[in-house]
Amino acid sequence: PQAAALHPDSINCIRVATFVKDGEPLVIYAACKAGTGGMAFDNMGRGGITMRFDLDTGKIAGQGHDEELKKYDRHPTTGIELKGYQMPMHEEVKALALKAALMYPEFHYVGWDICMTEKGPAIIEGNDYPGYDLAQIPDDGDPHPRYGLIPRFEKYGIEV
């Protein structure tokens, strides 16, 4: 219900980007995706918004952004305040992404779109090129607007 409340007409996923290094799955970033305006999709390219997501707390960690980089403090359809919004099953979502990454280690960098169901998290798809845009769009007041993903890869000794 909490994930659906964000935008009831779409399946609102958590994108968890993983990288497998030396047989160990690592989380590079996570983002929450939600549809808008009655649409059934959560994709930015079809009118959805995306927000940085903290897998440790299960909370949306920043503003929403659409494909034109318009920023939203509140969901444009439901009016729900985005930053700090608690999504369910974040620990299970993270565990599922790491497990999936180990099942396909030949694909080193994958973005797993995971939805929350009544029976637990479920993978909708794995993207073998999840891109970098979802995690690098700066928020207003972001103390590190040029932070990007390079430090996240370097943290694990991954050359980019």
Predicted regions and their residues:
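Short beta-strand or tight-loop elements
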Residues: 12-14, 107-110
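Short, basic/aromatic recognition patches
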Residues: 1, 98-101
